[in-house]
């Protein structure tokens, strides 16, 4: 069976964001690679050499992946809202912990609570501009 792993582009703060995500979601870094580690095959400006070329945070059976986008490739659209990262939890308590932890410093778009479709659900944009859904639904 295929596994879907979200991949997030950042404008230079991928390491900070992933350290924050790990502090809330748990897990371990499976890989951290900086642009300077690529050598001459992929030249970047010195000011961007320390930025993240690839970072992978293993969270249970899932992997959250990200990178910084070098300025030479253009900035990431921080207002893009075509997709969200959805986290399904095993309890209301876990949903609350993740919702309030990840939304700290961000903007809550839909407070967490019971919904007409029977789940415990909330959505927000975190302090890095990434949109999230946290949901507990005992039916799946």
Language-model features: locations:
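Glyoxalase I/VOC metalloenzyme domain signal
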Residues: 1-110, 123-140
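Short, small/polar residue-rich loop motifs at catalytic or cofactor-binding pockets
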Residues: 51, 116-119
